[in-house]
Amino acid sequence: MNRTSILALFVALLANAADVKTVHFPSEDHRTSLVAYLFEPAGPGPHAAIVLLHGRAGPYSSLAKGVYDATTLSRRHKQWGDFWADRGYFALLVDSFSPRGFPAGFPAGSYGDRPAEVSEQTVRPLDAYGALRYLRAQPGVIADRIGVQGWSNGAMTVLAIMSDQAPGKPASGFRAAVAEYPGCNMDSLKGEYHAYAPILMLIATNDEEVNPLTCEKFARRVKAAGSPLEFRIYPGAGHNYDDPESKAQSVPGNRRATEDTFQRAEAFFASQMKQ
């Protein structure tokens, strides 16, 4: 898919934008009331669903200017929510940061300074399981066909969620997961990592924020231990390669990675959840 095709995809998603509903539900931490944004597919259903987990910058546009709601979601999150709704899925974008007092998220390079209350390995998984509980209670959702997708910090949450040591209830957890450019340092886990359901991990060679070699070694180790993990590394792509902004998509490696990610993620979830 060339640059024109990528732009055509983005335009098509805008033209077929799904309705976005603001919803609230408790985290499985039993003390946080979460806000989330539900993209609804057309048709009577029932439908499978995908939980979306934002990165360190949070779910909102950098131009939000203090307004943090459905009208100021970042283009990337809106794009993916529309993409899944257009293909017959509910998509639920969970805001883990605003309810804890950090609506604008965190800048690059701030990992060591972030509070433990937004930990991607021990706290945010409980938010994801809260989202899972919420979706399973919705009449139009197929309760045993719910996947999860995350970016960067949210992708680290995905890896934590899919571990058989996950905070929450992994034995009755997500059907499948997509993790885009995680860091792969799973400090919260003891011993080998074992996934309880299939994972698609997507990494960029020119990532400016995380070391792709760490993820490559992690993926090889996890696969060797018998976990169902599919790994793809994109030459010439950087962190946040699927950002629809023109600056990111002007990089050829990012465009190629974006094209493949949309196609690969769609095929992956279709194979795992529409059986």
Placement of each model-derived feature along the sequence:
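N-terminal cap/lid segment of alpha/beta-hydrolase-fold proteins
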Residues: 18-45
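Serine-hydrolase catalytic machinery in alpha/beta-hydrolase-like enzymes
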Residues: 35, 49-134, 243-248
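Primarily recognizes the serine-hydrolase "nucleophile elbow" in alpha/beta-hydrolase
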Residues: 59, 118-195
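Short alpha-helix in the alpha/beta-hydrolase fold that links the catalytic acid
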Residues: 65-66, 211-221
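Short beta-strand/loop motif that positions the catalytic acidic residue
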Residues: 195, 201-203, 207
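C-terminal catalytic histidine-bearing segment of alpha/beta-hydrolase fold enzymes
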Residues: 228-275
